[in-house]
A protein has these predicted regions:
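Active-site helix-to-loop segments that bind/position phosphate- or nucleotide-bearing substrates
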Residues: 4-91
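Internal, well-folded beta-alpha domain core
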Residues: 89-239, 243-250
């Protein structure tokens, strides 16, 4: 069973905590993307990154001085977005760290599919970025089925905790033999169920922690998740989607 999760824009370098286990699987393709980005002007990159001058300058300098092989941080410790804050991998016990290393895959526009202990360096690149490398019209074409083939294992089970931007990289290549379960976190708003972005990110990270702490190997056990006010809604769920509702205190 594999769990897929989106990366985060905010990243740090931490070479003091834990040494990475390995380089990312697709480092050669990452090098190709790096070279393409370095060939662009600052203004072109600002358009690609869709950010302000300050963030453009920071990331332009990152790519100018980027070393993909030295002073690396384990991916799960480098990303600092909301989901990763609630996963809190820096306080994982050894068994929990081993669990995520075996089960969690972080999908990245720059690196492809990352194991938690793969060594990375901070970058800025989203899967939807308008990039043409070689014959590929965009990053979805560039990565093709590589991320799917990297993630799928003998169990044929994938738990989707990623955003649509990243889960699309996997969904296009699913086969009838695969069991793909998307997890939806929502709450009642009038007579509708809606997903609130920040709460969903919190819950995704908290669910990874829940699965690691409970060493979950069977998807049915995910239904026991009851943190951050969420509970499983069997009436809204199906074999391919597990829905959790957050109860809002009045």
């Amino acid at each position: 069973m594999k769990i897929i999760l989106s990366p985060a824009k905010k990243m740090i370098t931490d070479t003091d905590s834990i040494e990475p286990d390995a380089l990312p699987e697709f480092i050669e393709k990452t090098t190709e993307i790096q070279s393409w980005l370095k060939s662009k002007s600052k203004e072109e990159l600002k358009t690609i990154w869709k950010c302000n001058d300050k963030i453009t300058e920071q990331n332009f300098n990152r790519f100018e001085n980027m070393d993909l092989y030295h002073l690396l941080t384990p991916a799960v410790l480098s990303y600092e977005g909301i989901a990763f804050q609630y996963m809190a991998p820096s306080v994982f016990e050894d068994m929990q760290l081993e669990y995520v290393q075996n089960h969690l895959r972080i999908l990245s526009a720059f690196y492809g599919a990352l194991k938690p202990m793969d060594g990375v360096t901070p970058y800025r690149l989203e899967m939807q970025a308008k990039i043409r490398i070689g014959d590929a019209k965009n990053l979805y074409e560039y990565w093709g089925d590589l991320l799917y083939r990297s993630v799928i294992d003998d169990s044929r089970i994938i738990i989707n905790l990623a955003s649509k931007e990243y889960s699309k990289c996997i969904e296009k290549y699913l086969t009838p033999q695969d069991r793909y379960i998307s997890v939806t976190f929502c709450e009642a708003s009038g007579d509708k169920m809606v997903t609130k972005g920040t709460y969903a990110k919190m819950a995704r990270g908290e669910m990874v922690r829940f699965m690691a702490e409970n060493n979950i190997e069977n998807p049915v056990d995910i239904k026991k998740f009851d943190r951050l006010g969420y509970s499983f809604r069997s009436d809204l769920s199906s074999d391919t989607e597990y829905v959790f509702e957050r109860k809002i205190e009045q």
